[in-house]
Amino acid sequence: MDNQHLRPIRSFVIRGGRMTASQQKAFDRLWPEKGLAVENGLLDLESVFGRRSTVVLEIGFGMGQSLAEMAASEPDADFIGVEVHKPGVGALLRNMEEQSLENIRIFWDDANEVIDKCLPDASLDRVQLFFPDPWHKKRHNKRRIVQLEFVQRIRAKLKSGGVFHMATDWEPYAEHMMEIMSEAPGMENISGAGQFSPRPDTRPVTKFEKRGERLGHGVWDLMFRRVD
């Protein structure tokens, strides 16, 4: 079979749902300035943000509450958010407008496309992947975004000493992440071999997570740094 006709395995599904009126208005007003496009190719991060600063990539920011909170609490850092679901993009833009946040830019696209086509090598201080789809069924495990090949592509975009921070509330996925990350060349567990990390202050606790904690559900953080 001709390889060009093989469809890539996607780690996400496009959910339904329309933007609310307020999300759409925020999208219409802010997207021309705050939105980024894969087709424009490799980013000049200093030009994008108008300064040279710490740069953080968040993959799959959902409705964007946590990303907005992080950007507000780290005004000296610049954040690039990637999300495929338009209502989430609209919600984050509305948050950015309400809070006058200038240190976030957004891709409404597949993170794999963004990583491969838009991010310079050794340009990121931190990559965040919080609560990705766990793909519970065994036959769907191959759809999990955390795979060895993906980690190597993330590593290439991290600066030396840069951190890949993951979090999940699904223990089998946490174990899968640990197995993959422990095998990944050039990545070192900040908390020690085989150890999960305590939640750092840089990751806000979500309402969903607080509810889960009350019900006795666990959350697992993994933090690995690039070593050369």
From Swiss-Prot:
One of its GO terms (cellular component) is tRNA methyltransferase complex. Signal peptide: none annotated. The keyword Transport does not apply. It comes from Hahella chejuensis (strain KCTC 2396). Pathway: tRNA modification; N(7)-methylguanine-tRNA biosynthesis. CDD domains: AdoMet_MTases (cd02440). InterPro entries: SAM-dependent_MTases_sf, tRNA_(Gua-N-7)_MeTrfase_Trmb, tRNA_methyltr_TrmB_bact. S-adenosyl-L-methionine binds at residues 58, 83, 110, 133. It catalyses: guanosine(46) in tRNA + S-adenosyl-L-methionine = N(7)-methylguanosine(46) in tRNA + S-adenosyl-L-homocysteine. The active site is at 133. Residues 139-144 are annotated as: Interaction with RNA. Substrate binds at residues 137, 169, 206-209. HAMAP family: tRNA_methyltr_TrmB (MF_01057). It is an enzyme of class 2 (transferase). This is tRNA (guanine-N(7)-)-methyltransferase. Its EC number is 2.1.1.33. Catalyzes the formation of N(7)-methylguanine at position 46 (m7G46) in tRNA. The keyword Methyltransferase applies. GO terms for molecular function: tRNA (guanine(46)-N7)-methyltransferase activity. Belongs to the class I-like SAM-binding methyltransferase superfamily. TrmB family. Disulfide bonds: none annotated. Keywords: Methyltransferase, S-adenosyl-L-methionine, Transferase, tRNA processing.
